[in-house]
Amino acid sequence: PEIRAELEKRFGFVYPYEYRKDIPVKVSVSDLKKKSYHEDTDIEEAVYFEPDIVPLVPRFIEEKKEAEKAFTGSARGTAYHRVMECLEYNKTDSTQQLKEQIDALVQSKKMSEAEAECIRISDIQSFVNGALGQRMKAAALSGLLFREQPFVISRSAAEIDEAWDSQERVLVQGIIDAYFLEGDEIVLVDYKTDRVRRGEEQKLVDLYHTQLEDYAQALQRMTGRRVKEKYIYSFTLKKEILLG
């Protein structure tokens, strides 16, 4: 009995920090976003709601809508992000100029025709004509707009998952959509194509506030400048949302 008890004691031992093997060394912002979807919200990434009443529209418009339906979710978000990454602000005064820019992206193989088809030029025009878009345009024309900035930042594992040991550190990597300088301070901008209804802006804030805090912290460390404002721009709502 004593031998059996000793064997059970030795081989039945459970390592108290077994969960640590599940803690990754590095995670991406996309991984954290997926985790937030499962835990915190039912927000689904897509650009447009289907209308409650189906209007009578010309066939060519209906065909475009069908193409948009087929090209949904993250792929559509990627298309919008590509336009904003490559947007030439000195050629944004008209719808025609914006259309020519998108055509040029297709011609240069920076965007597929399917991606271009799902872009509503009016969405880009609304952004550029808005207050935030005008500030970004001014920064771009002065060489003070920066886009697609990669970063890596360290966070405690417990901040990512409460089940993980807070003493462990995890590297979070991602890409900042855009930021620009006003004086000696930074304005941070993140584009979203998530499907939300007007009046539900807080859903975006709840889902992405930690992500933008990581971005702001990374920028402050990289540049030594203070991030004075953090914005989410929703293409669905055609609205900028200032985070506190």
Indicate residue ranges for each PLM-predicted region.
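Structural signature of nuclease core domains in nucleic-acid processing machines
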Residues: 1-244
